[in-house]
Amino acid sequence: SVFHVMKTFVVIGLGRFGSAVATELSSLGHEVLAVDEREDHVQRVAEKVTHAVTGDARDPSVLRALGVRNYDCAVVAVGDDIGNSALITLNLKEIGVKRVICKAQSHVHRKVLEKIGADRVVFPEHEMGVKLAQGLSSSNVLNFIELSEDFGIVETAVPKEWHYETIQNLDVRARYKVNIIAVRRGKDGALNVAPGASYVIEPGDAVVALGRTEDINHLQDL
């Protein structure tokens, strides 16, 4: 993950998304400078991050004074106004911040940000919505992680016909074109990573499977 390699972050815009990113990065042990023009937003995270400052990031002199150039990565969480987030992104790139990650609200917004040099653009609301919909559409699914458009990892309850079968007998790879990478015993049980061929599936188990999205969907429908 990009966040593990880098150690110092500037987070600009402390709405729900920005403040969540700032506090989480801080709790993971990174140095975080949090910036917002609203004093109440800054106060909300002040105790939880390394530095919290009230300032207008649209003004390049403010960013220079804060020394943002010395940070590994900037997260622009000002998603509601294309003009503001574009201007801030441009400022950061011109000042020389190595990596700039931006939040966008739409595909048009994303295109604008990529054109002016954003290294990565995320759609938090859209991504959460997609994950929620995938979870709701299958009552079996406990968790779904999209690795790319075509591949994913899913944790799903095992179908009845798998009970008391060994992983070898199930031959999941040949039958369903997915790989079982772990099994969780019982609802809150321990995760058995890379279970052996002789592992017996029991009622209440959940499997963590890796594969193409279409094959994973088929597995969930069992």
Language-model segment annotations:
Residues S1-L222:
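Cytosolic regulatory regions of ion transport systems
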